[in-house]
Amino acid sequence: MNKKSILKKPKNAQSTQEKQLITWSKSLIDEARSRLQYDFFALEWIEKLVDPVSLETLEEARKYLRKSDYDQVVKERKLVNLCGYPVCPYEPKQQTRYKLEDSGMKVYGGLNYYCSKDCFLKSCQYMVELSDEPLWIREDAREAMKQHLDPRQDEAFRKELENKKIEDVRLLLQALPVGYKAKVGEIVEHPLANEQS
């Protein structure tokens, strides 16, 4: 007589659970990958704002930055000796932390990151208006990521770059003396044929 254990699950149930676990872990990995791409996108904007930018660029960045991201921009700009307000091209001035005013002593802790009180106030106003929501929750950021990660755009950009390189080579060839054009032309026009021989 064949005895069956009541504690063991049937093989079909176990394989179904394993499949569900695999599916769940794949979706979790995809979600983590997606969030990481959003973080890289925000990092690109942080890097873009380290150099002085126009007001339009700063307004565009508002859609993709959180307050903590903007704080990183201010700190990075201080490291490269620029005012913390991304529009300003000047160096920050060494400020004292405390100032005496009519109403008494006031603490200005963040002024060392800025060239003036005006830039400090503009930067604070900008930061207050930024969202605290993560980037992957915002609808406008999702649309931008779809465009940013569109493989057709990347392919079109690569083709455009290749065409530019070919045009640059042709311009260089035109500037060469007559005797050199034949040798260089063979190399440029038929690189694989020359490599095989």
UniProtKB/Swiss-Prot annotation:
What top-level branch of life does the organism fall under? Eukaryota
- Quick one: which residues bind Zn(2+)? C83, C88, C115, C119
One Pfam match, given by its short name, reads RPAP2_Rtr1
| Cellular component GO terms held in the UniProt record | cytosol; nucleus
Listed under catalytic activity are: O-phospho-L-seryl-[protein] + H2O = L-seryl-[protein] + phosphate; O-phospho-L-threonyl-[protein] + H2O = L-threonyl-[protein] + phosphate
Q: Where are the zinc fingers (RTR1-type)?
A: 60-139
Q: What Enzyme Commission number(s) does the record list for this chain?
A: 3.1.3.16
One annotated GO molecular function is: zinc ion binding
Q: What are the alphabetically sorted keywords of the record? A: Cytoplasm, Hydrolase, Metal-binding, Nucleus, Protein phosphatase, Transcription, Transcription regulation, Zinc, Zinc-finger
Q: Which InterPro entries match?
A: Rtr1/RPAP2, Rtr1/RPAP2_dom, Rtr1/RPAP2_sf
Could you mention a single GO BP entry for this protein? signaling
Q: Where in the cell is it found?
A: Cytoplasm; Nucleus
Cited PANTHER family: RNA POLYMERASE II SUBUNIT B1 CTD PHOSPHATASE RPAP2-RELATED
Q: Which family does it belong to?
A: Belongs to the RPAP2 family.
Q: Please give the function described in this protein's UniProt entry.
A: Putative RNA polymerase II subunit B1 C-terminal domain (CTD) phosphatase involved in RNA polymerase II transcription regulation.
Q: What is this protein called?
A: Putative RNA polymerase II subunit B1 CTD phosphatase rtr1
Species source reads Schizosaccharomyces pombe (strain 972 / ATCC 24843)
